Amino acid sequence: MGSAPVIVRRAEVTDAPALSALGAATFRETFDDSNTPEDMARYVAEAFFPEQQAADIVDPRSVMLVAEHREPTGATALIGYAQIRSGDVPAEVPGANPLELKRLYVLRAWHGKGVAQDLMNTCLTIARARGCDTLWLGVWEHNTRAQTFYRKYGFVRVGQHDFVLGTDVQTDWLMARAMSDG
């Protein structure tokens, strides 16, 4: 992991199988301890299959980014990803042209190494280039690590909504940041 380079790039359709595995792995690392095995299995099966990832990659309303680690041998592995997209916006989210930060996950082994920051900074650059005035997201009310990370980037809580994981209805905080804030 040390000094080998990590690059952030736009995902390609050929990344879909690896992105599917990464999405499932990072979601499980983050939420397995807080949900039933049945609910996790159902959600992961519905959200992280290769065809869904491929559809998200080619969707013109979406930008899917991957963080790729390159070993000195030339071998590569996906270690994180992020997705921003336009679409339905909750009423609590301000702005005339908001974008959603749909997902931002990094493998636990890479936490604290700047990968999440690189992904977030790339998302902010893309959002600005698209004329976005507000970037918003939903984060589980009990995911304090993620909430702290988002606050460092100027996100504030603007509301909440339900997130259904299997049979469990959970509360996500809606957080947003004005893009004029730098």
Spell out what each predicted region is.
Residues P5-I7:
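Extreme N-terminal starter segment of soluble prokaryotic enzymes
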Residues R10-T14, S20-D33, E38-H111, M120-T122, ...:
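Acetyl-CoA-dependent GNAT
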Residues A18, D118, R145:
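Charged catalytic carboxylate motif
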Residues L65, G95-L99, D133-Q147, R151-G182:
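C-terminal "cap" of GNAT-fold acetyltransferases
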